[in-house]
Amino acid sequence: MNSMSSGHLLSRSLLKLPMSVLVKGTAIPSNPIQDLDIDTHKPVIYALPFRSNVDLLTLQTHAKEAGLPDPLEPLMLNGKAFQRYVFIASRPTLLSSDQHVPSDSIALFSELLTEHKLDSELDVQVIPATVLWGRKPGKEGQERPYLQALNGPEKALAVLASGRDCLVRFSPVVSMRYMADTHGTDASIAHKLARVARIHFSRQKLAASGPNLPQRAQLFARLMNSPAIEKAIADEAKSKQIPLEKARKEAHDILDEIAADFSYSLVKKGDRILGWLWNRIYQGLNINNAATVRRLAQDGHEIVYVPCHRSHMDYLLLSYVLYHEGMVPPHIAAGINLNFFPAGPIFRRGGAFFIRRSFKGAPLYSTIFREYLAELFAKGYSVEYFSEGGRSRTGRLLPAKTGMLAMTIQAMLRGLNRPVTLVPVYIGYEHVMEVGTYAKELRGKRKEKENAGLVLRTLRKLRNFGQGYVNFGEPIPLNQFLNETVPQWTQDIDPMGESKPQWMTPTVNKLANRMMTHINDAAAVNAMTLCATALLASRQRALARDNLIKQVDCYLSLLRNVPYSATSTLPSESAEKLVEHAESLDKFVVETDTMGDIISLDRNQSILMTYYRNNIIHLLALPSLIAQLLIRQQSVSLEKVQATVAQIYPFLKQELFLRFEAEELNDLVLRYVAELARQGLVTVEGKTVTLNQAQTQVLMLLGRIISETLQRYAIALNLLVSCPHLGKAELEEKSQEVAQRLGRLHGINAPEFFDKGVFASLFVTLQEQGYLDDQGRCVLETAKPLSRQLYALIYPEVRMTIQESLCQVDA
């Protein structure tokens, strides 16, 4: 045994120098102790898939960097020394490929299980660790095991080729105490432990590399010969009265336009370029809740990423983050507008597949796209599509476009044998590079068509963009969602993909709403969104520095002490540090007088800043509504606060994708009021809440966050009551006109204030809540009290403008 271990020691010491030059790995997760909940006070051993000194030394480097025990240092238990690592399989040589569990590993597991039998307090944590040399997926048709043992020469080649693309993956701990208590401590349990570890390692590799990639020609041939596409080609030839061959060529061209051409080498090179780019333009990337997604990938889920869409940067950022978190970059549905040279071919090789804006009147295109998407799901590739259908121009989450969601459920109705899970993703920035363009488009300027010149002009503007945020929201397991919503859904499974059951549309709409709510739940609060919210709430878009810090502190305290959701994130810095950081991004005017600094926004920046405020307005909507009620009423009963919130909440919930159900509101109001009282903004005596006059400004600025939204509701409701004869389309149009007038007279810059889409969705909610009947006519007995309540919540001068405008409409 000694000669063998001294041989190992010699080979390890000889390997150290070349490996220090050739190997630069990434640990996943980067902070395993925190992410995997490893108890550093309990003993730790490591399990590796194959006997390999190279893997062991690579693991040693990353374990020590992460603050974990050195795998090469013995583990001392009750005065006995144990090896701190086990190999689950032997290493093949050039002459043999023994894949059995090494006897010394079984012996170590057995000895440790015996120790657990003797010492009831002992709990050794086994950390499975995989060292992956390169993450290149295989090609279709090359059926090899996902995790392969490499002999000496193969390992040397792997280190030379992929030493810089090495991934050290730590997995959740396996408790030997749990194994001993649940399964006993005999020798067969040691074998079972080794078998479980082997399956686990294979899944690890699949999660990191993804399934084998299709040969494009084979994929095309398979799809072109599928019954659904053959039928669509025949229908196309018949309806257009063209030869079958011509229709086939058309179908092939469509497939060529749509299909991705994924290239691992491009992803690898792109990763380096993007790493350089992010370091140049962002001060940091903040990634949250990635461990949840890693677990899903490892458990074999078909993952569909559904991010919000703020910027063209989103495509690159999410793929980069997933790759760095040890997952496979997804196939991304990209708008056909991005298929221009040279971006189109690059995106395509990075995993983009292209989608036209509309499928209307194109049954052949629709069928081919649906079949291609179903093929991606069937083969197990992760997919990403932007739920809003386009970039948000206002910074608010747009209502979902449901076409891709419907096609996802249709793919499930073919009988997919794997669970499908939606992963909502919130992407946030302290600077969105297109924000100036968005403001122009909202003022009526035509959207500039994407082209190479536009890309170059954008690249020229790249500078300090502050922080970027990628928050993974709470996943939505679709099989579970369908079981709850449509228990009989499996009866509609049809391998041909023709199934369009009646339950599809309402179910997809419900799913879309849940998906958008989960995206907003994962919002990232940052310095820019907080400062923009505070400055825009002040009438002159200006605050003394001390007051700005005080206001940001109020928002932070509210969000920390009454957390919005488990997946939203807050900065850890103080309000003072956040204001300092926001200033460094160069968007504010700072003037100094004898009494200190005044921070303000010029007219143009005021418009742009609404974008950042809108990113987090939903997080502060309810405390803002409570504050506005208190500012207008001065003193009010708790029951009145609860009743007002309950009355207005359905509109806010629909518009801002808020997460709370009606039955949670009363308790939530009490928690918000208690926090406002803790901050000294209000006092609570018995059942009455009264504002604290000394702190009126802080409460007023909090209330003004939601005041423009309430003004919009007041316009719609009072128009409805004063002109009950108007139809829905006329009501939407007139509401928009009154809002535009109000905006001009009162200096409201928010582009969404008179957005037609926002009014359209408001009238849908009015009907759902019973303020309009089935014919769209006003139900006066419910609408009148609400219209009065909304008037009471807004400022008198704004109310007068609305009343004057409504008189002119009525005339």
Curated annotation (Swiss-Prot):
Q: Which GO terms describe its biological process?
A: CDP-diacylglycerol biosynthetic process; fatty acid metabolic process; phospholipid biosynthetic process
UniProt keyword annotation of Lyase present: no
Q: In which pathway does it act?
A: Phospholipid metabolism; CDP-diacylglycerol biosynthesis; CDP-diacylglycerol from sn-glycerol 3-phosphate: step 1/3
MF terms (GO), sorted A to Z: glycerol-3-phosphate O-acyltransferase activity
Q: Name one GO cellular component term.
A: plasma membrane
Cite the entry's keywords alphabetically: Acyltransferase, Cell inner membrane, Cell membrane, Lipid biosynthesis, Lipid metabolism, Membrane, Phospholipid biosynthesis, Phospholipid metabolism, Transferase
Catalytic activity, as annotated: sn-glycerol 3-phosphate + an acyl-CoA = a 1-acyl-sn-glycero-3-phosphate + CoA
Q: What is its main location?
A: membrane
Uppermost EC category? transferase
Concerning InterPro entries, the annotation shows: GPAT/DHAPAT, GPAT/DHAPAT_C, GPAT/DHAPAT_LPLAT, GPAT_PlsB, Plipid/glycerol_acylTrfase
User: Is Transcription set as a keyword in this record?
Assistant: no
- What is its membrane topology? Peripheral membrane protein
SUPFAM superfamilies (UniProt xref):
Glycerol-3-phosphate (1)-acyltransferase
Subcellular location per the Swiss-Prot or TrEMBL entry: Cell inner membrane
Q: Where is this motif: HXXXXD motif?
A: 309-314
Give the superkingdom in one word: Bacteria
- As recorded in UniProt, its EC number(s) are 2.3.1.15
Q: What is known of its domains?
A: The HXXXXD motif is essential for acyltransferase activity and may constitute the binding site for the phosphate moiety of the glycerol-3-phosphate.
Provide the family line.
Belongs to the GPAT/DAPAT family.
HAMAP family to which the protein is assigned, alphabetical: Glyc3P_acyltrans (MF_00393)
- The molecule here is called Glycerol-3-phosphate acyltransferase
Annotated source species: Vibrio cholerae serotype O1 (strain ATCC 39315 / El Tor Inaba N16961)
